[in-house]
């Protein structure tokens, strides 16, 4: 056999004899075991090591079992289901030396589980995370829904491209007081605020921002990802300071408004376009679209005039409506 062929054969043998363990560290002493989830799946062989210089007299227990699981500095276990996950502790002489928490990440038919968060199905299927920005400053808010209310933990990471993984900072996920009804069921809403450190509002974006939400429910781990440009998640705040001014010898009134305080400046560069509509009790008038901050409308008694805004040069989301009463 040619020497080069011998080296290749030996290398292949080493690969076959050294299976890759699908386990990684989520945080200190917390590990995620990735499992193919199907009937009679073999599971994953996991080796735990006691974090101690001691060598003798070490025993292992689990919070899932009252029995001693093994002895020695390492413990080898076969992880097949949630009953094999949980906290493993090594002891000596009645004293706990170190602990390791095992979480499971399920994969069924090649697809990672998405049991913890609710699919909001907008703007497309598998929309678990939604993000919005009020302007081009690099600050944005993301949120997600879940029916679960206990034993739940989230962490959020974000970056713009792989070259600067620390370029976007996200705070802690917060449970909103707002409940969201979807498909005849109520869901808890969690939000997180993020800020790009070196954002340049006027610059053309070339690298996507990526947001990753890691979710842990009891012993189940899942992660969810959303990628976007800031320009694609822009939703301005509603116009402010709506006012009506009667016009002499006319049934019409002039409605005026101002740019929202949160919108990027200068407004000559970051311009908005507006939609104006008169809304009565049983009827909505035709919408008027314009770039200026005033319009003439016929204002009926018991009706409202409402105005919304969006980016003039890029098709952002429309803002929520701001309204003023005609009466």
UniProtKB/Swiss-Prot annotation:
Give GO terms for biological process. interleukin-12-mediated signaling pathway; natural killer cell activation; positive regulation of activated T cell proliferation; positive regulation of type II interferon production; T-helper cell differentiation; type II interferon production
Which residues does the UniProt record annotate as the domain Fibronectin type-III?
238-327
Sugar attachment sites: 223
- Keyword entries, A-Z: Cytokine, Disulfide bond, Glycoprotein, Immunoglobulin domain, Secreted, Signal
Q: Which GO terms describe its molecular function?
A: cytokine activity; cytokine receptor activity; interleukin-12 alpha subunit binding; interleukin-12 receptor binding
Name where it's found.
Answer: Secreted
Q: What broad class describes the main subcellular location of this protein?
A: secreted
Instruction: Report disulfide bridges, numbered on this chain.
Output: 50-90
* SUPFAM superfamilies, per database record: Fibronectin type III (SSF49265), Immunoglobulin (SSF48726)
The answer on whether this UniProt entry bears the keyword Cell division reads: no
Q: Please name the PROSITE patterns in this protein's record.
A: FN3, HEMATOPO_REC_L_F3, IG_LIKE
Residue stretches making up the Ig-like C2-type domain: 23-106
Output the Gene Ontology cellular-component terms. Answer: extracellular space; interleukin-12 complex; membrane
Q: Where is the signal peptide?
A: 1-22
User: What does this protein do, in the record's words?
Assistant: Cytokine that can act as a growth factor for activated T and NK cells, enhance the lytic activity of NK/lymphokine-activated killer cells, and stimulate the production of IFN-gamma by resting PBMC. Associates with IL23A to form the IL-23 interleukin, a heterodimeric cytokine which functions in innate and adaptive immunity. IL-23 may constitute with IL-17 an acute response to infection in peripheral tissues. IL-23 binds to a heterodimeric receptor complex composed of IL12RB1 and IL23R, activates the Jak-Stat signaling cascade, stimulates memory rather than naive T-cells and promotes production of pro-inflammatory cytokines. IL-23 induces autoimmune inflammation and thus may be responsible for autoimmune inflammatory diseases and may be important for tumorigenesis.
Q: Which family does it belong to?
A: Belongs to the IL-12B family.
Instruction: State the PANTHER family in the record.
Output: INTERLEUKIN-12 SUBUNIT BETA (PTHR48485:SF4), INTERLEUKIN-12 SUBUNIT BETA-RELATED (PTHR48485)
How it assembles, according to the record, is: Heterodimer with IL12A; disulfide-linked. The heterodimer is known as interleukin IL-12. Heterodimer with IL23A; disulfide-linked. The heterodimer is known as interleukin IL-23. Also secreted as a monomer. Interacts with NBR1; this interaction promotes IL-12 secretion.
What's the protein here called?
A: Interleukin-12 subunit beta
Name of the coding gene:
IL12B
